[in-house]
Amino acid sequence: MEQEICVIGFSGGQDSTTLAVWAKKRFKKVCLVGFDYAQKHSVELECAQKIASLLQLPYEIIPLDFLENITHSALFKNSNDLMGHSHAQNKDLPNSFVPNRNAIFITLLHSYAQKLGASNIALGVSQADFSGYPDCKEDFIKSIEHALNLGSNTAIKIVTPLMFLSKAQEFQMAKDLGVLDLIIKETHTCYQGERKILHAYGYGCDKCPACQLRKKGFEEFQAML
């Protein structure tokens, strides 16, 4: 186990929960940080709080509800846009994309890491099985790590152990870590905030892009067994 502190961007979803369990086994102290950005699926914050308690890890929520006032996304509570279409600001991106969201998240995590004296920030981003978001790619993560360290005269590392894992491989990782049941029953991925129906892969509407990606990954995981 590394004798260092690690700050995790934590949504209460499959990726960040798997990441939190992984980090807990590797770092002396792990701190979870969530963001309330007026997302439709704000139920994820409730799930994150419960998971943090189950994992016995400290959890902070940073309010960022101003985001919906400065940019567009179908993920915002007040948006009437239906998922599955092109973004109003960039036709090459899905409308669930929140421009600069990860840049803002990572900047705040970097600041918080400095306050705690943390040497590491861990993110559950993946470019192997993602939703078409450019701010989940390795080149972006490496670039912002370099820029933030230059701007703060620091050497904080951003670790992304899920970067090249598919959703199926993430389910396998959760199984290997002994938390597959936790991932299925407690984490939240659905963009519509659906928590009434438990599918084999977890709760969700079974229709939005996030549910479809998770469902596909679980089916591929089952085929691997």
Curated annotation (Swiss-Prot):
Keyword match Magnesium: no
Cofactor note: Binds 1 zinc ion per subunit.
GO terms under biological process: queuosine biosynthetic process
Cofactor or coenzyme needed: Zn(2+)
Residues noted as binding Zn(2+) in the record, renumbered to the chain: 190, 205, 208, 211
KW Heme (keyword) present: no
Residues reported in the UniProt entry to bind ATP: 10-20
Gene3D superfamilies listed in its UniProt record: HUPs
Top-rank taxon, per record: Bacteria
GO terms assigned for molecular function: ATP binding; ligase activity, forming carbon-nitrogen bonds; zinc ion binding
EC class of the enzyme, as a word: ligase
EC number: 6.3.4.20
Pfam families assigned: QueC (PF06508)
Pathway the protein contributes to: Purine metabolism; 7-cyano-7-deazaguanine biosynthesis
Physiological role: Catalyzes the ATP-dependent conversion of 7-carboxy-7-deazaguanine (CDG) to 7-cyano-7-deazaguanine (preQ(0)).
Protein name: 7-cyano-7-deazaguanine synthase
